[in-house]
Amino acid sequence: MENKHIRIKEYLLNLLESGQLKGGDRLPGARRLTKESGVSYTHIQTVIETLVQNGIFETVPRSGTFVQQGWQSRILPATFACNILPWIDKLDEIIRKDLPQIHVCRKFTKGIFEFRVTHYLFSHHDEYLDLMPLFKECFPDEENYFLKLLNPFIVDGKLCGIPWIFSPRILLYNRRLFREAGCPIPHDNWSWDDFLTTVDLLKRKIAPGQIIDWQQSLHYWINLVVRSGGSLFEPAAEDPVKIDSSETIRGLRLYAELRERLFPDGSAGLPQDVFENEFAAGRAAMAFAPRQYLYKLKLHPSAQELELAGVSIPTPEGGRRASMLAADLFCIRKNCTDMRLGRECAKLLFSEAVQDYFGKTGYGIPFRRSSAQKALKLDDELDVKFLTEIPQMVYDYNIFSPELYALVTDGVGALCLLPSEKIAEEAHRLADAIRIFLRIKRSRKLQTA
């Protein structure tokens, strides 16, 4: 009985996620559903009724059953959301084999079980369970994991996520394009001025949009903020807002100056997906990247022809050697009603076999030490570069609410598009607005205490 219910649930959800059924569409008739799924209509009707209760479908008397608008935002039991990741088909295969009751989502934006990136998890931590009890129960061999990586994700005394894979960020570059431009190969101790000289040399041969991946997103500009010695917040400080500190402003100004140097006409870079394709095809020169990026590159038809190398992100004068942590973290939402399944899911994802497999694909560095040792090759120049950057990793986003996350990502992203000489003034305005927001939030918290 249960297997039939799982089969029809998968069938119906796949109709939605493949686009065969859209919001407002009427479900096919009983005869077609029975024929295509191979399950009796009695079982189909039971699953449909459950999905009606879950807000996926709605039944209209004398008209039939229809797909709800906005079904993608519903959170279904026994679902795993990681829809933006490039290896989702392989993960689906692994989970389906051992835990067939879990549906791996392609289009649902949230699941009971999820992989989330670092800055998103910090800002939405209160939506997730404390996983420390699960970690201690499921992984008694805890010395076989990079335990220090758990510390950043303990917020208000609770472990909101377990790093599944992680990586420092470096600067990837294409040796062939450097050679053709007559540009010296960069070295790990290069300065910001060295980097700008490199940009100018590359501009002789390469279109500005193909020199480096310049984007407004947090995980781009944050690299120069931390390399300049800046940060976003310091929760323990009397004034925790550091967006308008001199170091942070310097990093943002440098990032804006890079845009101005590349695009003096006021335009911006290529869309992220377009640049990634250009880089994979060997037509773009440099990219800020964690090891996860290598997996995407390998999927491109021209991957074997790339002459890839890696170097530390340049350090501005007076800055610090720092590399922002990039991680995919396993999380469980608070509305999980089946922790047994959660434990089984965690055991599978952090098993030696699964960690070994994804480590060897080049997708990040596994959280399991033995898998990381197998994945990182000492005779591979890029792997050695990622290894040497691990001690430099920092993770001090310290953005602990969705509202604050939106203020920072949208606000600072907009700053980066301003003329560089206006960055300081507008950073102070943004920081003051955030201070007001934090005071209001603190006041409300005291009133409800």
Regions found by a protein language model. Name each.
Residues 1-27, 31-36:
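Extreme N-terminal segment that seeds HTH/winged-HTH DNA-binding domains in transcriptional regulators
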Residues 49-92:
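HTH-adjacent hinge/linker in prokaryotic transcriptional regulators
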